[in-house]
Amino acid sequence: MDVTVQDDEIDGPFGPVPVRRYSPVAGGSDALAPTVVWLHGGGFFRGSLNQPEADSVAHALARQGYPVVTVDYRLAPLPLLGWLGSRQKRSNRYPVAVGDVLAVVQRLSNSVGDAIVLGGASAGACIAAGAALRYQDEGGKLSGVLLAYGFFHRTHPATMEKGHRPRGHRRFTHSRWALNLMNRNYLGRAPASADCYAFPGGGDLTGFPPTLHLIAERDGMRPSAELFVAELEAVGSSVERHLISGSKHAFLNHPNGNEFATGVELMSQWLNRDAPHERTHEDESAFGLRL
């Protein structure tokens, strides 16, 4: 299926938010799947719309018939080196990224209602989960949530089987100490009461939308991902968990890999679990973005 790509921008609470729309050419049919709002990872402080985890995933899903909007949310400063950045960059800690994402979801809901699936990978999964929880608490409704090798707790769980530990440089960059530092850098001076949206793990998840959770096998963030699945199940949320055998963290950044293909196929199957939402051509063009 052919895909058209358009860069746009919307107004958010912290300034303009760049987005990229991937629209499948549907051959004249008005029966379209829910729109996926997708967030790249990068530890809250790096990443862009051009990295494969954003662009390749969006292209792959759009070719399956799912409209996708990727969000260039504002990035936090480098951990321990935030003083090197601009004053504006230093201020881009929580809740800025969540606010950027919610602005996109709210604008999109004006045209497609609740036919929205919010998702992301790694840090993007954490932002997506926090934004989904806040959107729900503010009266919004989503069709579902897509999460890939995410982490969801302010302090990373300590338990990890030896065979699941990361190798290579990630033994250090994804050590529990480094991950907790990354989280503290993202949270900044936000009050502890904000944690339920910054890091939704351990909070009240009652009524959380139906969720697909893809977990990397050898990943320092896996304990948090597994715990979050258990927390969703404990409150009766619908959650479908898949462990991608042999995978490492960020496998969606490698579009030529088997794990990438497996992950996208699982997403597509899960998105197709219900009948498509009916949408008109007017809906498709009514996102209301400005160049």
What are these regions (language model features)?
Residues D2-L291:
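Alpha/beta-hydrolase superfamily serine-hydrolase fold, recognizing
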